[in-house]
């Protein structure tokens, strides 16, 4: 569970960093660039710890997929970016892909260790 929390923190940091980049590009303040640098760095740090127990392909797909989905939604709400039918179709496909990747991942079952038999 701890590693899933780290992955969630990585996703939040990625979203915050990317939105900060956009904010910095439309404002005259350098604070956005500093926040972007810090948050994207934290995102990679959290992701690197999360993949200790979460399969890399699953963690990366969730990190990027959920990040893209939420960044797109927030950019529409915060920066008045357009959301076309093609973007909606792409986001829907992305959600389906995330669900398929996550549902196709199973924990490996632990094989019971054979007991060593003493030989005489």
Swiss-Prot record:
Membrane topology classification: Multi-pass membrane protein
GO molecular function (one): choline transmembrane transporter activity
Classification via Pfam families: Multi_Drug_Res
Biological processes annotated in GO: glycine betaine transport
Coiled coil feature spans: none
Location(s), subcellular: Cell inner membrane
Domain of life, source organism: Bacteria
Example of a GO cellular component annotation carried by this entry: plasma membrane
Quaternary assembly: Forms a complex with MdtI.
Physiological role: Catalyzes the excretion of spermidine.
Name of the featured protein: Spermidine export protein MdtJ
Lineage, top ranks: Bacteria, Pseudomonadati, Pseudomonadota, Gammaproteobacteria, Enterobacterales
């Amino acid at each position: 569970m701890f590693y899933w929390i780290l992955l969630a923190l990585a996703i939040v940091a990625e979203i915050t960093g990317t939105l900060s980049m956009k904010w910095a590009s439309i404002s005259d303040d350098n604070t956005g660039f500093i926040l972007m640098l810090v948050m994207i760095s934290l995102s990679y740090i959290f992701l690197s710890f999360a993949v200790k127990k979460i399969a890399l392909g699953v963690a990366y797909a969730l990190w990027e997929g959920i990040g893209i989905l939420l960044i797109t939604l927030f950019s529409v709400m915060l920066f008045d970016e357009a959301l076309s039918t093609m973007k909606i179709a792409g986001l829907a496909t992305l959600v389906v892909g995330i669900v398929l990747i996550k549902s196709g991942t199973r924990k490996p079952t632990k094989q019971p260790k054979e007991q060593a038999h003493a030989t005489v």
